[in-house]
């Protein structure tokens, strides 16, 4: 594992709701523009988003705050240790 790889983390965030496919697309596009975000996987059926991020540039708390700022209400989060 190189130095950069050890800073790559994943967090799974459960949202209050994702009403439509357009919500998932909006969420994906919004997060992709945020600093430190490497990848976003949205599972609309289960109201979850898995975010791969660089822990030197952002934190799960910041990602959750960003989601809250655009009307997606996080219900909880789980740090994934791969």
PLM features: residue spans?
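Short acidic amphipathic segments
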Residues: 28-46, 73
């Amino acid at each position: 594992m190189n130095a950069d790889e050890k800073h790559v983390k994943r967090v799974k965030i459960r949202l209050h709701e994702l009403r439509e496919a357009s919500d998932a697309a909006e969420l994906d596009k919004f997060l992709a523009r945020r600093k430190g975000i490497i990848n976003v996987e949205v599972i609309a059926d289960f109201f979850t988003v898995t975010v791969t991020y660089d822990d030197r540039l952002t934190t799960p708390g910041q990602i959750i705050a960003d989601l809250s700022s655009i009307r997606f209400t996080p219900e909880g989060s789980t740090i994934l240790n791969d």
